[in-house]
């Protein structure tokens, strides 16, 4: 349990890359938290936007790897914003503050949706050079919770965390995925009620991405492939190309992970 949080890589990252806090709105309570690593001479960095449960440091492994190859990487944590236009306006101000005219955006889940909304928001004066979308979506209606979006601010923190945790895998997973889930649960615990409520509101508020406004932007789509979905209709790979031997190995790995205390 908690292997990632106590790992040498994570501790080295936290001790060498400073967490910056920046205010760009008139409301001083709206604070952007970010890690900015890599050569400052690069004016078109890769910016990571986290999911509902994520903080800026959930991307520490990507930051360490990419900066080692010479990239400039910025990982963000959002302030409390209650609608997509407010977020886009705040993010634009942040880029202006950082003196970044063009950026590459990587977004996971909610982060991927917000990345698309920002690209849409700036389509007349483009700020997004490319999009990398991991388990993202382009229409909030897929969650069937648009009718509850305006009530999240009323809910206590424990109830909001329960909603988010309901999306985490509860079945047997491979050890690396189990460590990742533990780490994300730990990061979730660090978020306050208003942070969670605002993120869930952005995640479920009735909205969609207008495709014609981002059609000229290169997009890379990443789909996470979990072992328990291997060979099923939920897999990222066509089940017809999965061999019986692979399925036997997968079943054995999951059985072992389930037996471990």
Swiss-Prot record:
Compartments where located: Cytoplasm
Family: Belongs to the AB hydrolase superfamily.
Phosphoprotein is among the record's keywords: yes
Gene name of this polypeptide: Spg21
GO cellular component labels: cytosol; trans-Golgi network transport vesicle
UniProt name for this protein: Maspardin
Taxonomic source organism: Rattus norvegicus (Rat)
Entry keyword set: Cytoplasm, Phosphoprotein
Functional note: May play a role as a negative regulatory factor in CD4-dependent T-cell activation.
Residue stretches making up the AB hydrolase-1 domain: 87-159
Signal sequence segment: none
């Amino acid at each position: 349990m908690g292997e990632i949080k106590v790992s040498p890589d994570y501790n080295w990252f936290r001790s060498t890359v400073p967490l910056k806090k920046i205010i760009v709105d008139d409301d001083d309570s709206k604070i952007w938290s970010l890690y900015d690593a890599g050569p400052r001479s690069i004016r078109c960095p890769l910016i990571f936007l986290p999911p509902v449960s994520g903080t800026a440091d959930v991307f520490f492994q990507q930051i360490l790897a990419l900066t080692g190859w010479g990239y400039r990487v910025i990982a963000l944590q959002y302030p409390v914003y209650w609608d997509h236009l407010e977020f886009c306006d705040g993010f634009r101000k942040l880029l202006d503050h950082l003196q970044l005219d063009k950026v590459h955006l990587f977004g996971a889940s909610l982060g991927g949706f917000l990345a698309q909304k920002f690209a849409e928001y700036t389509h007349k004066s483009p700020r997004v050079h490319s999009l990398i979308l991991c388990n993202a979506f382009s229409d909030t209606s897929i969650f069937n919770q648009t009718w509850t979006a305006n009530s999240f601010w009323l809910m206590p923190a424990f109830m909001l965390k329960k909603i988010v945790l309901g999306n985490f895998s509860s079945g047997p997973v491979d050890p690396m995925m189990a460590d990742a889930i533990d780490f994300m649960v730990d990061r979730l615990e660090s978020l306050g009620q208003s942070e969670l409520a605002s993120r869930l509101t952005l995640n479920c508020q009735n909205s969609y991405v207008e495709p014609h406004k981002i059609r000229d932007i290169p997009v890379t789509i990443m789909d996470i492939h979990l072992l328990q979905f291997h060979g099923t209709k939920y897999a990222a790979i066509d089940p017809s190309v999965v061999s019986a031997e692979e399925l036997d190995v997968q079943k054995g790995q999951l059985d072992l992970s389930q037996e471990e205390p």
